[in-house]
Amino acid sequence: MDATTGAVLYQKLQLWEPGMESEEEEEEEEIAEPLVLSLRRLQNTPGNKVGGLPGAWTRLLAGLLLLAVSSSLALRQLQGRNSPKGNLGPVDLPASRHSHHPGVYHHSAVISPAATCSRLGQELLVAGGNVVDAGVGAALCLAVVHPHATGLGATFWGLFYNSSSGNSTALTAGPAQILAPGLGLPTALPALHLLHTHFGRLPWSHLLAKPAMLAQKGFEVDAPLASALAAQGTEGLCPLFCHTNGTPLGLGAQVTNPNLAAVLLREALASSPDLVGNALLNLLVRDLGLELPSVQPKPSLEPALQLLLPQGVLFTTPGPSAGPELMGLLESTLHSKTPSPASCSSLLQTAETPVSSALATVDSHGSMLLLTSSLNSSFGSGHLSPSTGVLLSNLEASSVPSTWACPLILRGNLDDTEDDMLGLVASGIPRGAKAMACTLFNHLTTPQTQQQVQHQAQQRPTESPGICGKEALLQVVVHAEHAQVSSIPSGCCPFQGY
């Protein structure tokens, strides 16, 4: 190097890892700055001025830096092997220094009443499935582990927004039909299969495999199921949900339902959409000593109802769900600018509640699926089919709207694909349409920064136990190319994502 060469300029070298984004730069500056300052101090010492063997100093510094890094890594590996927690394998480095608050994910997320089913939904997402695959898989899982609130005998409503097409589609249950007085016709399998056929990505059999395995090998009674069993008693539910002495199973007890597993595996082999649900129906009528009904379940996919708002476009389900009532309430609420956001919580705290279940899946591109289902009462009819392990609903054939079903999606601006999206779906909330209207009004009148604070305050660890009652409101948000999930009350519904 010539003596005329200018001063050496040191530049910060930033470590790059897959998945890191621009938000990481601030954190990396804090880590890198002390190192850069130290190098600059050495550069300015008398022995390191131009003409003072700068090349030698540079090589020496590089050697010392490499030695320090290698020594540090070796020490960390040695500490890992000698850790009192045992051999944890290679040092666990975070995939990214870009951190999020709980419930915020780069790609996709699922939130449901059961930790097992939220994990199953996440597995389907990671396996290449979309939000419909994850939602349908989680719903089938809930049919196994939460028989008090949903199941193959339940009625399903859903709302799906496709970010690629910009279309929103409603899954409708069709008119309520009965097998016998007090026993509703099961429609869950035809409804979920219809939704998956049109919008899913993974094979139908793939979605049924894990729920069938849970039913066959067993699952733990979680807090919501244990609470429902304690309140319900055991009449009609033994031996599946009872101890040998006839008392109901408690928290942590193991349940196996091999007959339900067999039904799910048979349905996985259905050769055509028209045959989905037939295996279950044939076994049920045999159990009950009935003939096959002449009218088959008629779930359908229909365009969602739409309402233009100053803030964007609202989508919800058509009648006989509570969607039309929700639309009317929103129009009057937004015009009168009432109720006060503070009054929303009172709508979520009512003694008498319908029994239902809800889940939501979302991805960072804006696609989302909201599903809600009901057996009408806790454990439905209370009649456990011996050959199928299925509990039928006690829904009656009538024209009364499904007041528990009014999922909604707010698309911020159809002309801006980067705008925020919001999805809301409730379970067990009386006056559901009013509660949803109030919650949406709160969202529309709250500044964006305050919404972020509220979302963060609603989060608890994903494995939070069942600390809430039957009422829950699930919220999914797409903001800044991230998927966010939360619940009210906070922490009552486990979530997973990646």
From Swiss-Prot:
Designated name of the protein: Glutathione hydrolase 6
Superkingdom of source: Eukaryota
Broad class of the protein's primary localization: membrane
PANTHER family linked: GLUTATHIONE HYDROLASE 6
Post-translational modification: Cleaved by autocatalysis into a large and a small subunit and the autocatalytic cleavage is essential to the functional activation of the enzyme.
Keyword Membrane set for record: yes
Reactions the enzyme catalyzes: an N-terminal (5-L-glutamyl)-[peptide] + an alpha-amino acid = 5-L-glutamyl amino acid + an N-terminal L-alpha-aminoacyl-[peptide]; glutathione + H2O = L-cysteinylglycine + L-glutamate; an S-substituted glutathione + H2O = an S-substituted L-cysteinylglycine + L-glutamate
Cytoplasmic side, ranges: 1-49
Extracellular side of membrane: 71-498
Localization: Membrane
One matching Pfam family: G_glu_transpept
Pathway: Sulfur metabolism; glutathione metabolism
Membrane-spanning parts: 50-70
Entry GO MF terms: glutathione hydrolase activity; leukotriene C4 gamma-glutamyl transferase activity
Glycosylation: residue positions: 162, 167, 376
E.C. no: 3.4.19.13, 2.3.2.2
Summary of the function given for this chain in its UniProt record: Hydrolyzes and transfers gamma-glutamyl moieties from glutathione and other gamma-glutamyl compounds to acceptors.
Subunit structure: Heterodimer composed of the light and heavy chains. The active site is located in the light chain.
Recorded family membership: Belongs to the gamma-glutamyltransferase family.
